[in-house]
A protein has these predicted regions:
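Glycine-rich FAD pyrophosphate-binding loop
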Residues: 26-43
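Glycine-rich Rossmann-fold phosphate-binding loop(s) that bind the pyrophosphate
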Residues: 13-16, 37
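Mobile amphipathic helical/loop "lid" adjacent to a hydrophobic cofactor/ligand pocket
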Residues: 16-17, 28
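Conserved N-terminal helical subregion
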Residues: 2-9, 24, 48-165, 169-186
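Conserved Rossmann-like nucleotide-cofactor binding loop
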Residues: 17, 40, 157
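Conserved hydrophobic helix-helix packing surfaces used for dimerization/oligomerization
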Residues: 9-11, 32
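Charged, low-complexity surface patches
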Residues: 14, 44, 101
Length: 187
């Protein structure tokens, strides 16, 4: 199928989701305008075989694997007592690995920068207005971007979701959070 799109597809958000969408579309020849500020990317990711298949479809599996640590198992311990609770052993035939979010972002940015049909604008969007023909995005500097298609990749508290759902307030904060951490094996 031939790409007949002439105006760029705007992607709001420059995190992992936004960059991945930009690479997928850009690799297919679509013009893409990626708008937003690069986010802070603390922490890490555990990648499963499905995750590596997704990265492979973007041409990034080898680049990510070069920066990742292969996992043979995941050990779950009680944080307060260091008591061993359980262990999940991974089948060696199926790749599991841990990698920092920043390393994933660096690989995504490097790949996106090789695609000439992807344009970056480093700005913060203040308003998203959905119209019948086009969407209008207004930056904090007053710049206006209009597009036939907008992909919202600015997170669950982002403007794209608020524009679609009509919710302008923040969602309630959960009482508990699940977290993953690395702790020295000697502790």
């Amino acid at each position: 199928m031939t790409n007949t799109v002439t105006s760029p597809i705007v992607i709001l958000g420059r995190g992992i989701a936004g960059l991945s969408a930009a690479i997928a579309l850009g690799s297919a020849g679509y013009p893409v305008h990626l708008i937003g500020r690069p986010p802070a990317t603390p922490g890490g990711l555990q990648l499963s075989p499905n995750g590596f298949r997704a990265l492979s479809s973007l041409g990034l599996d080898k680049a990510i694997l070069d920066k990742a640590d292969r996992l043979n198992a995941v050990v779950i311990k009680a944080l307060s007592t260091n008591r061993h609770l359980t262990e999940i052993i991974h089948d060696p035939k199926h790749l599991h690995a841990a990698v920092s979010r920043q390393d994933v972002m660096d690989c995504l940015v490097a790949k996106a920068e090789t695609l000439s049909c992807i344009r970056f604008t480093d700005t913060e969007i203040h308003t998203v207005q959905l119209g019948t023909e086009k969407a209008k995005l207004v930056s904090v500097d007053g710049d206006i971007f209009s597009a036939d298609e907008v992909i919202g990749a600015d997170g669950p508290k982002g403007l794209a979701r608020a524009a679609l759902t009509g919710q302008n307030s923040m969602p309630p904060q959960p009482a508990y959070r699940a977290m993953r951490a690395e702790i020295e094996a000697t502790k």
